[in-house]
């Protein structure tokens, strides 16, 4: 008999932990799609929920959805905080980097040498806003830069002016005011105009805040940067509904669809049921 389980970040086996950054897990074999473990921690009066999210390598929207009764800015001292750190691998080739836009999370499949077990690591990311959508498709890393210089695109400058904001300087040198942070990796998609990069605004990780690029916590892209060679495949997919098997149990993981596709997902629950039946 098969069992079906639904989780929207929150599923079984809550484990209390004290500190975790991005963990590397053994990649489950094909036919098993789930890895990681749901955990809990306790808030202290000196930190916000977003501080906790960064400490445990979770995005802002992820931790808010997992903890709807915990105040974002002033969590009660000792409040239990659920850390949504169990994942269904998106349905795509398990190779290189795999970004699922609705999930705002990227998966990394390191190349495996003979005799080594295949591994998987995952990181939260920020993605493009509704009017600056991060493009879907199969791409690759074509360039890597440490301490990059940033030339703001004309479209972004015009947007800032239209919103009554000061435009950026025409050239932003490396340093603490550079929005790209200290690391940038250029994608082939979109004529090379999209980057995976760090940020000087880490609270935007796990949100739709960019002009189409992919933002990572500074410490995450620093850890990833030297592991990713030029030529690494990057898949960008749109899967708000994910299905995954663990032994004889089918799990379904739901994420809010991208705002521009809300009409398509108007009957979200029925689509989830249809996905199971298919």
Model-derived regions, located:
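Loop/turn positions that initiate beta-strands
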Residues: 46, 76-81, 231-234
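Extracellular LysM carbohydrate-binding repeats and other cell-envelope/extracellular binding modules
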Residues: 23-35, 60-97, 240
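Sec/Tat-exported extracytoplasmic proteins
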Residues: 56, 60, 67-71, 85, ...
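Bacterial N-terminal signal peptides
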Residues: 5-16
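LysM (lysin motif) carbohydrate-binding repeats in extracellular/periplasmic proteins that recognize
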Residues: 44-74, 118-119
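Intrinsically disordered, low-complexity
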Residues: 68, 77, 83-142, 146-149, ...
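Exported/periplasmic cell-wall-interacting domains
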Residues: 157-278
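Primarily a LysM-type cell-wall glycan-binding module
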Residues: 24-57
């Amino acid at each position: 008999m098969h069992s079906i389980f639904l989780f929207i970040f929150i599923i079984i086996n809550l484990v209390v932990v004290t500190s975790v950054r991005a963990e590397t897990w053994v990649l489950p074999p094909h036919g098993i799609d789930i890895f990681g473990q749901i955990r809990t921690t306790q808030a202290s009066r000196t930190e916000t929920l977003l501080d906790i999210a960064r400490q445990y390598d979770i995005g802002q929207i992820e931790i808010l959805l997992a903890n709807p009764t915990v105040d974002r800015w002033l969590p009660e001292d000792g409040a239990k905080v659920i850390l949504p750190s169990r994942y269904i691998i998106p349905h795509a080739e398990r190779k290189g980097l795999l970004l699922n836009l609705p999930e705002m999370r990227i998966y990394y499949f390191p190349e495996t040498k003979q005799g080594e077990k295949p591994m998987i690591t995952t990181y939260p990311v920020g993605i493009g806003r509704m009017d600056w959508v991060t493009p879907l498709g199969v791409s690759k890393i074509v360039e890597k830069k440490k301490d990059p210089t940033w030339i703001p695109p004309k479209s972004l400058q015009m947007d800032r002016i239209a919103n009554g904001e000061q435009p950026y300087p025409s050239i932003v040198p490396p340093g603490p005011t550079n929005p790209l942070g200290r690391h940038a990796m250029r994608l082939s998609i979109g004529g090379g105009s999209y980057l995976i990069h760090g940020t000087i605004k880490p609270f935007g990780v796990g949100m739709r805040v960019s002009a189409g690029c992919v933002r990572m916590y500074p410490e995450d892209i620093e850890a990833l940067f030297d592991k990713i060679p030029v030529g690494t495949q990057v898949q960008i997919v749109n899967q708000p509904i994910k299905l995954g098997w663990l032994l004889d149990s089918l799990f379904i993981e739901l994420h809010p669809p991208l705002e521009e596709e809300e009409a398509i997902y108007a009957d979200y629950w029925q689509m989830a049921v249809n996905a199971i039946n298919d």
